[in-house]
UniProtKB/Swiss-Prot annotation:
This is Phosphoribosylformylglycinamidine cyclo-ligase. It is found in: Cytoplasm. The keyword Ligase applies. GO terms for cellular component: cytosol. HAMAP family: AIRS. Its main location: cytoplasm. One of its GO terms (molecular function) is phosphoribosylamine-glycine ligase activity. One of its GO terms (biological process) is 'de novo' IMP biosynthetic process. It is an enzyme of class 6 (ligase). It catalyses: 2-formamido-N(1)-(5-O-phospho-beta-D-ribosyl)acetamidine + ATP = 5-amino-1-(5-phospho-beta-D-ribosyl)imidazole + ADP + phosphate + H(+). Keywords: ATP-binding, Cytoplasm, Ligase, Nucleotide-binding, Purine biosynthesis. Its EC number is 6.3.3.1. The lineage of its organism: Bacteria, Pseudomonadati, Myxococcota, Polyangia, Polyangiales.
Amino acid sequence: MSVTYREAGVDIDAGDALVERIKRLAKPTRIPEVLADVGGFAGLCALPGGLSEPVLVSGTDGVGTKLKVAFATGVHDTVGIDLVAMCVNDVLTVGARPLFFLDYFATGKLDVDVGEAVVRGIAEGCKQAGCALIGGETAELPGMYADGEYDLAGFAVGVVERSRILDGKRIAAGDAVIGVASSGLHSNGFSLARRVLEKEMGLTMSDRVADLGGTVGEALLTPTRIYARAITALLAACGDAVRGLSHITGGGLPGNLPRVLPDGLGARLDLGSYQRPAVFQVLQRGGPVEEAEMRRTFNLGVGLVAVVEKGAADRAIEAFAKSGEQAWVLGEVVSVGDVPFEERVLFG
């Protein structure tokens, strides 16, 4: 008696059914530069007009163990937003406009409804970012993942005029450091967060915590902010006064802000200049987790940092506000001399 691919654990019909659903989800994300529909061997996207020296900008990332929260809660339609955010926000830091996005979804046994929910989130993230979902890969890998689990990876490409690339080289001592609010943990630090909440505090994802304003799962699954519209507004309002942008991800402020600062420069930040979101307070008390560990693990409520000329700080904050983002003066750029990377962010 013959053996089939389905009996070996790969259901081609389920994969085809998911592709048809993905086509419908991707269609509303299409931009004028896209030249082909989802479903071919390759996605096609033309460079936008009006650029004399267009430079392509790429970024790739995943969602990490935030996926464990999706598995535990059965909520799968937000981690796709996180996936787009993690890739697109990196591309945005050099001043690029996001063009297109591709995803990789891998699972042991394909559940078409779960796959559709994940891609629905990806499509929503692409809409927020103004980029097109032009393709991806769905891999059914029997025996590679536990039942009901999957992994995600994403890849974003944007474009920027060569002369408008933000590389941080013009940052100078005295420049203002503008903090832009995160929505919570975003997509980093979840291994520590889950350890504190589940092991140290004995909570489940369905438990309600007054300080969180809902369940543990709801607080943790809050989607990562996508700053595409905000950065477009910032650049329009402030132009060359924008000196650099930093996406605050794993490593927190000390691990990310120095990546855009020239040698010899650091930043003095005032963490008392804003209200730290409740989720971080719950985690710090619940561990307990030392402040230094909090700073190098979580974004602490700051999802993006913009470095601008001091005189442009008010304009920058206003531009962020008009695009729906909360922003404030978090600190300033200072001279620090020859110090280790991790010591270039000072907290005062």
